[in-house]
């Protein structure tokens, strides 16, 4: 995974545009009734960025570990929430956490940058660090977004593309069935949202570890 992209290009731009305080309109709130979000839990915000969802879970009394590949994003997060535990992590490598460490692993638009082999390994790692009965909650880009990106991507493997030096995976239901086969589905919804004034075609999901 390209560490330089996230430090030099992505967060260089979006640190100026994102709002860490805006936590009440986050999509996960619509599913609070399904995951007992007010019960104190050990949460991993995997691919946390600057930490909007970290703050969301902290505000509800959870113990949160925030992990990202970007040193710049983690420095910003630590400056704004000094008490949070941060771990720099490349998700194409084994996760730096203990077996059965977390009640919730949360990954907002952060696991769709990997090849089939890397994605398979990542989901196995997420299952490893989740407690039995723990929740894997997140979102990924949908294959319905292909029409918006087809003119500037090169296909590397099925549903996996290079976009100007950055890899991106687009997900459909079959991929959830394959990669998440050892998890129990609670929620799987395809949605269209607006992000930074652009249309975002994505899946929202909640799965439960066995």
What are these model-derived regions, one by one?
Residues 1-39, 49-94, 137-209:
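Class I (Rossmann-like) S-adenosyl-L-methionine-dependent methyltransferase catalytic domain
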Residues 45:
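Class I SAM-dependent methyltransferase core
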Residues 95-105:
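A short acidic, Gly/Pro-enriched loop at the edge of an enzyme's catalytic core
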Residues 120-132:
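A short glycine-rich, Lys/Arg-flanked "PGG" loop and its adjoining helix->strand segment in the class I
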Residues 112-114:
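A short His-aromatic
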Residues 107-110:
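A short beta-strand submotif of the Rossmann-like class I SAM-dependent methyltransferase core
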Residues 116-117, 149:
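Conserved catalytic-core motifs of eukaryotic protein kinase domains, centered on the activation segment
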């Amino acid at each position: 995974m390209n560490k330089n992209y996230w430090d030099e290009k992505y967060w260089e731009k979006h640190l100026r545009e994102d709002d860490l305080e805006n936590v009440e309109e986050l999509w996960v709130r619509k599913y609070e009734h399904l995951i007992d979000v007010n019960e104190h839990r050990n949460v991993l915000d995997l691919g946390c960025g600057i930490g909007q969802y970290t703050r969301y879970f902290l505000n509800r009394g959870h113990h949160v570990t925030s992990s990202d590949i970007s040193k710049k994003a983690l420095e910003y997060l630590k400056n704004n929430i000094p008490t949070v535990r941060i771990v720099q992590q490349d998700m194409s490598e084994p996760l730096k956490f203990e077996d059965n460490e977390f009640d919730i692993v949360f990954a907002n638009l952060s696991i769709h940058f990997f090849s089939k082999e890397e994605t398979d390994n990542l989901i196995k790692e997420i299952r490893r660090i989740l407690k039995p009965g723990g929740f894997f909650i997140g979102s990924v880009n949908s294959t319905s977004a292909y029409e918006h990106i087809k003119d500037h991507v090169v296909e590397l493997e099925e549903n996996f593309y290079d976009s100007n030096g950055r890899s991106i995976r687009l997900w459909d239901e079959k991929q959830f069935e394959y990669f998440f086969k050892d998890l129990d589905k609670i929620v799987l919804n395809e949605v269209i949202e607006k992000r930074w004034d652009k249309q975002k075609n994505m899946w929202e999901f909640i799965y439960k570890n066995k």
